[in-house]
C-alpha cells in the first residue's frame, strides 16, 4: 500500500501545484505509515519530484497523452492505483 500522487505538468515540466501535491502526499504517507508513489505523464525531468518525498516514480510517456484527454489520463491513473495497491490518491 502506498499513497499515489498524480503530478500535473505542462510542456514536460512539473507545475507548481504538482510539487505541492507531492509534498502533501508525503505528509499523508507519514501519517499512514507508508510511502509515496508518483505518476508522471510526459515529464522530461521526473526525478525532481523525489525532492518532495516521493520514493517511487511511475513514468508514463506517450504521444497519445501529449494533449490532455480526460479518459486516457484517468485510465493511466486507474492502472497505477491498481498496480500499486494505493490506499490514497492525491491529485494536483
Question: What are these language model-derived features?
Answer:
Residues 1-92:
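N-terminal glycine-rich FAD/FM-binding segment characteristic of electron-transfer flavoproteins
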Amino acid at each position: 500500500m502506498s499513497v499515489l500522487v498524480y503530478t500535473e505538468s505542462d510542456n514536460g515540466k512539473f507545475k507548481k501545484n504538482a510539487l505541492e501535491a507531492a509534498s502533501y502526499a508525503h505528509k499523508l504517507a507519514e501519517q499512514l505509515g507508508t510511502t509515496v508513489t508518483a505518476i508522471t505523464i510526459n515529464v522530461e525531468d521526473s526525478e525532481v519530484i523525489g525532492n518532495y518525498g516521493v520514493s517511487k516514480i511511475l513514468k508514463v510517456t506517450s504521444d497519445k497523452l501529449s494533449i490532455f484527454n480526460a479518459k486516457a489520463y484517468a485510465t493511466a491513473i486507474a492502472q497505477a492505483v491498481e498496480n500499486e495497491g494505493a490506499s490514497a490518491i492525491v491529485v494536483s
